[in-house]
Every structure is written in structure tokens, then in C-alpha cells.
Amino acid sequence: MMLRSRSAIRSGLCLLFLLLIASVYASYTQGTQSSATVSFTLDFPQSIPDHYALKVSSDGHAEYNSTGKLTPDSEPPDPFHLEFTISPATREKIFDFAAKAKYFEGKVDSGKRNIASTGNKVLAYHDAQRNTQAEYNYSPNPAVQELTSIFQNISTTLEFGRRLDYYHHYQKLALEAELKTMEEMVRSKSLEELQAVSPILEQIATDQSVINISRSRAQRLLALGGTPIASH
């Protein structure tokens, strides 16, 4: 009887130990998967912005930081920081293209000296197994080209949001030109992640002190970004 009791205790302890190991492994695996990031940095003096960095995590969290003037004639403002959730479709494309680009291991720049400078770019990948990056001006690699386009389009969208927020506070008549340009760029598929600037678009769309044509444009952009204003 006592032997059976000891055996049962040992079996129970073994089972508990195995469950503990499984739990630790599951937590480690989940942490490893969620820690993967792809980032893009651009430094291009005299452009607007002259520097920005965008990092996307495999869990959908994204961070954007930029410096530079709002317009060519304005004074340099404080650095701009924004955190948002990237759409699943864009996140999937980013990590898929990173894999196709072999996670930026090795050289990706064309190495050609007769290509005009479009800014110093850095693509980087980080997870539990890799920590790689590649610097380039122009790359002939199709996956790198796709990533460059995606990140630049996201930056353009977020910089629109930055200017819209400023104009909404200090120069409301300037909103119309910005919103009109945004609509045109959406049609030409030159913007990504419109939902990231939905808060300022909602503020404009519901602000009675903004002219109607600008409010209507903001409403259309919200609908295109998948966050239409609810009708009352």
C-alpha cells in the first residue's frame, strides 16, 4: 500500500515537472515569435522628413519616429513619435518580403555609382536567432524594392497625419490642400496604413469649424481606411 502511494506521488511529481517544462517552452516559443521585428531607416538631408525610422513587430505593433520640418519654410518642430497597430495584410507582406530578401544578410545595394542618391536606407531584421541589417541607396533585389516602397508609403501617410494635426490646431484653411493631395495619392496607391491616422481624420470630419469640403474629404479617407464615421 505504501509502495503504491509512493509510486503515485512520484508519478504525480513527474507529471507536474513535465507540465512545468511544457509551460516554460510554450512561453519561450510565444516570446520568440512575438519578438521578431523588421525595421526601416531613411536618412536624406534636405528632404522632409530628413530622417525617419519605422519598426514593425510580428505581433502587429509598430513604432514611427521622424525629425524635420513640417514644410520647407517652417522651423524644425519637436521629434515626431507615433505608435500604432499595423494591418495584418501589411504585416504579413513585410515579413514575407523580409524572408524573400534572406533577412538582409549580405549586400543588397547595387554598388553602382552612377545612380542618383535617394537617401541612405537601412533594413534590419531581429528575432531570437537573427540580428541582421543591410545598408543601401538602391537595390536591384525585388523584395527589398517592395519593402522600401511599403515603408516609404507608410511614412508618407504618417507625415500627412502629422501635418493635419498641426493645421487643425493652427491653420485650418490649409487642411483642404493636404486632404485633397491625400485623396489623389490614395487613388494612385501611394499611401499605406490609412487607419493609422484615423484619429486626426475623425477630429477633422466631426469639427463644425472646418469647411464642409474638407470634412467630406476626411470622411471619404476614413472610409477608405476602413474606419468610417458612424451616422447619427
Map each language-model feature to its residues.
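Acidic/histidine-rich, surface-exposed loop or edge segments in extracytoplasmic proteins
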Residues: 63-82, 180-183, 199-200
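N-terminal post-signal-peptidase region of extra-cytosolic proteins
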Residues: 40, 49, 77-81, 103-109
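Short, well-ordered, aromatic-rich surface patches in folded extracellular/luminal domains
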Residues: 6, 25-46, 107-232
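Bacterial N-terminal signal peptides that target proteins for export
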Residues: 2-14
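N-terminal secretory signal peptides
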Residues: 43, 48-75
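Charged, amphipathic alpha-helical segments
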Residues: 88-111
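A short, structured loop/turn motif at beta-sheet edges
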Residues: 58, 85-93, 125-131
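Bacterial N-terminal signal peptides
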Residues: 12-23
